[in-house]
From Swiss-Prot:
Cited function: Involved in the uptake of glucose.
GO cellular component, one term: plasma membrane
Coiled-coil region: none
Gene expressing this chain: glcU
PANTHER family noted in UniProt: TRANSMEMBRANE PROTEIN 144 (PTHR16119:SF17)
Membrane topology according to the record: Multi-pass membrane protein
Naturally occurring in which organism (per UniProt): Bacillus subtilis (strain 168)
Keyword flag Zinc-finger: no
Gene Ontology BP annotations: sporulation resulting in formation of a cellular spore
Record's protein name: Glucose uptake protein GlcU
Length: 287
């Protein structure tokens, strides 16, 4: 039961972009709607849990939320260019690499031979996985798709920076869990407004995309509940399984066309990235 509970964040987070695309709108209205949904749930949770809030927690949480908006908005821009099934494995891989390297450099993780071995293997798996999931169809090259791939990856670099700061700022100041949820959601809405207001995001699609925000906050809630039960490392590894849901959802629900060659490459790439997430989770416990 505890493991099933720990899988819920992956189910919730993996389905967010599928809802974003299905509900329609551009990346700006999608971003704004998602942040509003997250804020609604965070306010409700705050009144039930009533976590301790200090000025430090509030400021750090808002800064963290601002950068989450940067990450999410650019991830949705990339999806518009490359599709869900290509964007999400690459995005997940980039996030795992960046947060892992930051952990090693700043927080001195991977301090044991086992952790170093698993960590290096994980990074190799992620890089190979990203290459495989971004494999192009030979026929697409005539239609200018490689330029979309390049643009999409450049946008994902900005997205990864946003997600990295979102995670790292909270960790640097030891702000996490229930206390961070509401301040982060406020920061997300502020960031969403700043990033999107020039693009007239206030429309029916922004309202529709409140639903993915509710789902995102629900995933966070289940992550906080499951961590004490299964441990941070297991919870972290399982939460990365969302890549399976988003990628397969992109192919089978959103009907993104793939050749047999691409499907095989994507399947192998996903397996490698998931294995890397498991290795990183184990490395955390052996540091």
């Amino acid at each position: 039961m505890d493991l099933l509970l720990a899988l819920l964040p992956a189910l919730f987070w993996g389905s967010i972009v599928l809802f974003n695309v299905k509900l329609g709108g551009g990346p700006y209205s999608q971003t704004l709607g998602t942040t509003i949904g997250a804020l609604i749930v965070s306010i409700v949770i705050y009144f039930f849990v009533q976590p301790v809030l200090s000025l430090r927690i509030f400021i750090v949480g808002i800064v963290s939320g601002l950068f989450w908006s940067l990450g999410q908005a650019n991830q949705l821009k990339s999806i518009q260019l490359m599709g869900v099934s290509k964007t999400m494995p690459i995005s997940t891989g980039m996030q795992l690499v960046s947060t892992s390297l930051f952990g090693v450099i700043v927080f001195r993780e991977w301090s044991t031979p086992i952790a170093i071995t698993l960590g290096v293997l994980a990074l190799i798996f992620i890089i190979v996985g990203i290459i495989l999931t971004s494999l192009e169809d030979k026929n697409d090259k005539k239609e200018g798709e490689p330029s979309n791939l390049k643009k999409g990856i450049l946008i994902l670099l900005v997205s990864t920076l946003g997600y990295l700061v979102y995670v790292v700022v909270a960790r640097l100041f030891n702000v996490s869990g229930w206390s961070a949820l509401l301040p982060q959601a406020i920061g997300m809405v502020v960031g969403g407004l700043v990033l999107t207001y020039r693009h007239k995001p206030f429309n029916k699609y922004a309202i529709r995309n409140i639903l993915p925000g509710l789902i995102w906050a629900g995933g966070n809630m289940f992550l906080f509940i499951s961590q004490p039960r299964v441990g941070v490392a297991t919870s972290f590894s399982l939460s990365q399984m969302g890549i399976v849901i988003s990628t397969l959802g992109g192919i089978f629900i959103l009907r993104e066309k793939k050749t047999k060659r691409q499907l095989i490459a994507i399947a192998i790439g996903i397996i490698l990235i998931i294995a890397a997430a498991v290795f990183l989770g184990i490395a955390k416990t052996n540091s």
